[in-house]
Amino acid sequence: MTGQSSSQAATPIQWWKPALFFLVVIAGLWYVKWEPYYGKAFTAAETHSIGKSILAQADANPWQAALDYAMIYFLAVWKAAVLGVILGSLIQVLIPRDWLLRTLGQSRFRGTLLGTLFSLPGMMCTCCAAPVAAGMRRQQVSMGGALAFWMGNPVLNPATLVFMGFVLGWGFAAIRLVAGLVMVLLIATLVQKWVRETPQSQAPVEIDIPEAQGGFFSRWGRALWTLFWSTIPVYILAVLVLGAARVWLFPHADGAVDNSLMWVVAMAVAGCLFVIPTAAEIPIVQTMMLAGMGTAPALALLMTLPAVSLPSLIMLRKAFPAKALWLTGAMVAVSGVIVGGLALLF
């Protein structure tokens, strides 16, 4: 099978596969991310706001709060979520596996660094980037490379940093950039070092079959269905659960969140659990700071809220060993506590 795949990869007509993939990437990101964010940057510069907090006005009834939040959330992310699933499936059938192994498949730091660099144009939230990371893992991309790509999308999003500078101040944006870069590279490197690949994750996947056993559309259909079924249903359920719990996770009462270590830890942990659209951490923190939240808890929340979430961790349960996901979530929370704790000292 290896020899057959290699001969197919060398066939001259195979160039259309990566070309088609990058065409979909560019067109999709332009429509979903790049063009809308270009206009939003001017809005942020003129008004020092990018909208209302998605957490505002939670209903007292948990079931109604869950439905309300799910409606607002999915209206904001559905285009990016669809694009994420499409790209996560296409990467399994259009990009030669040996390309991925030469770049992102290495367990050395180079793979982690490249995963971070490749994440920058994506600008996706953690849940929309999760299907792409899952597709990469199905092609045997290293844990470090896939984790760096997954976390780098929301944490190092260039558009979010620009919005943050105009809305919260460039000091916040600089801290997020520097601390975020360290967090992404360090966590991905440590997880790669401390967690061993499972035999299941190292084995070839079912959809990686020779052309003779299926054409492009049949193989893409199988990849798309497998990826959708393993990520989207639990994604929807987890968003509903967190929508019901948002009023307890993020208190908005005046003076409720003061500038103390207790609230730094609380906001760091809550940020790791909750799920938000891209850049939604900015109006959330802006609203909570106007209600009296201190700078230290705000920084902790800015670090952890976009980085991971309970739904995205669940979505990747079949792509990474459980230990890798637990470590990632825990180290993101610790990173938020460290950044917030340093703010208390200075």
For each feature predicted by the language model, list its residue ranges.
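Intrinsically disordered, low-complexity non-transmembrane regions of multi-pass membrane transporters
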Residues: M1-L23, G39-N61, R196-A223
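Alpha-helical transmembrane segments of multipass membrane proteins
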Residues: G88, Q92, M183-V191, L242, ...
